[in-house]
């Protein structure tokens, strides 16, 4: 149990994220297409709010870290050609935008 708590504290594990590619439903039926996200992170989740509140003041926390990792992986695979990875950068930017808007709307839950 302590190992699981350390993983969650470090921000490397989200129990709601499906990591098995065979179980991911890329086009779920009945989902409103206006609310579709092009990034795997959920910056407004309760877990991210908790992690952000529990971090030290001098510590940096990025709720869009999965999108950031994907951007770096794309750069590595494409010989650091930024044009090839534009979609990944856009996805990260949208994730950060959603997170900052959520923090501005509800400052009490994002201490």
From Swiss-Prot:
Keywords: Disulfide bond, Mitochondrion, Transit peptide
UniProt-listed PROSITE patterns: CHCH
The keyword Disulfide bond appears for this protein: yes
UniProt xrefs under InterPro entries: CHCH (IPR010625), COX23 (IPR051040), Cys_alpha_HP_mot_SF (IPR009069)
Disulfide topology: 64-95, 74-85
Motif (Cx9C motif 2): 85-95
Region (Disordered) residue spans: 1-26
Domain CHCH, first and last residues per copy: 61-103
Role played: Required for the assembly of cytochrome c oxidase.
Membership in a protein family: Belongs to the COX23 family.
Protein's name according to its UniProt entry: Cytochrome c oxidase-assembly factor COX23, mitochondrial
Species the sequence originates in: Candida glabrata (strain ATCC 2001 / BCRC 20586 / JCM 3761 / NBRC 0622 / NRRL Y-65 / CBS 138) (Yeast)
């Amino acid at each position: 149990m302590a190992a699981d708590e350390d993983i969650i504290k470090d921000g490397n594990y989200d129990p709601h994220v499906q990591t098995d590619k065979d179980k991911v439903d890329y086009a779920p039926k009945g989902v409103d297409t206006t609310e579709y996200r092009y990034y795997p992170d959920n910056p407004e989740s309760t877990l991210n709010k908790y992690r952000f509140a529990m971090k030290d003041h001098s510590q940096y926390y990025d709720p869009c870290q999965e999108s950031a990792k994907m951007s770096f992986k794309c750069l590595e695979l494409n010989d650091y050609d930024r044009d090839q990875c534009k979609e990944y950068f856009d996805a990260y930017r949208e994730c950060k935008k959603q997170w900052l808007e959520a923090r501005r709307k509800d400052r009490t839950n994002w201490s």
